[in-house]
Amino acid sequence: MDSNTVSSFQDILMRMSKMQLGSSSEDLNGMITQFESLKLYRDSLGKAVMRMGDLHSLQSRNGNWRRQLSQKFEEIRWLIEEVRHRLKITENSFEQITFMQALQLLLEVEQEMRTFSFQLI
């Protein structure tokens, strides 16, 4: 995932905000912050996969690493469910497209995190 992915997600959330979908800007900023945090975590997983020495150190810290990974998956699942919920309650087709784009990005990030984490396990 690159900075374009984060920018795309921010653009989508800003469009949501401008459409006044009942989401406060505080909620949307929180979603952007969580998404950026997940992006950084996903990037760190990718870097760890590339460094062989880290695999051994990750295995030695396995319990803590698995708890952290579990927490990150809970965060992204929450974001996915939040976007799905908003998608279900909106009737405007433009808003639905915006939510679909946000959902697609979140699902892509979740898949990338899963791919890297399975390589590390």
Swiss-Prot record:
GO terms for biological process: exit of virus from host cell nucleus through nuclear pore. This is Nuclear export protein. Gene3D superfamilies: 1.10.287.230, S15/NS1, RNA-binding. Belongs to the influenza viruses NEP family. Average number present in a viral particle is estimated to be 130-200 molecules. InterPro entries: Flu_NS2 (IPR000968). The gene is NS. The keyword Transport applies.
